[in-house]
Amino acid sequence: MSLTYKGAGAPSLSDINFTAKRGQTIGVIGGTGSGKSSLISLIPRFYDATEGSVEIMGRPVRQYPRVDLRGKVAVVMQKAQLFGGTIRSNLLWGSQNASDADLWAALETAQAAEFVKAKPLGLDEPVEQGGRNLSGGQKQRLTIARALVGKPDILILDDSASALDYATDAALRKALAALPGDLTVFIVSQRAASLQHADQIIVLDDGRMVGLGRHAELLESCPVYKEIYESQFKKGDAQK
């Protein structure tokens, strides 16, 4: 599968080929401009592949009605988007039919329940437009919770835990892995430490997939991944 943006002289992605099984956690890592966001944008059809195809459950994504695809795939971007209202009203954008129990379950998984419970009004605590009255980490956790409220088949986290400390990031990944059912999670991250326990890690470099495997395998077989990991380890960023 390849992707060339309209008007671009060269492809942003070339010869990408992988299979993600239901229930797996897939890590995506690479340097700036390597194609990470381009890759995950093909799953919900923000863009369409110019060569090859992306399939969900054996069916090309182009064959899904967009409304059905949006119900199957939830994307959480690095820049959290919150609306003026309350915590509850923001979460209900994930599903208008969600009960309070559903909201709290999503908050627990997203590691947001504790700070919401500490608010005087809990779920009814006011949220300013853009979440101006919340910290970066709180906003990211609420947007992850909102995505979970919709009960998607595929959850894409595009560097959306970047404002979380390592302990909270690790707790989030553990909670996602423990969810019942067959949720497939794509984690795009600059932190190799965030992907160490993924079932598969896709390593991108200049729009090409230069590595695919588990953490230990890639340390042995993929120079690009090894370089990323070791550079972060030396800085104290790559932790178990």
Predicted regions mapped to residue ranges:
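ABC-type nucleotide-binding domain
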Residues: M1-K240
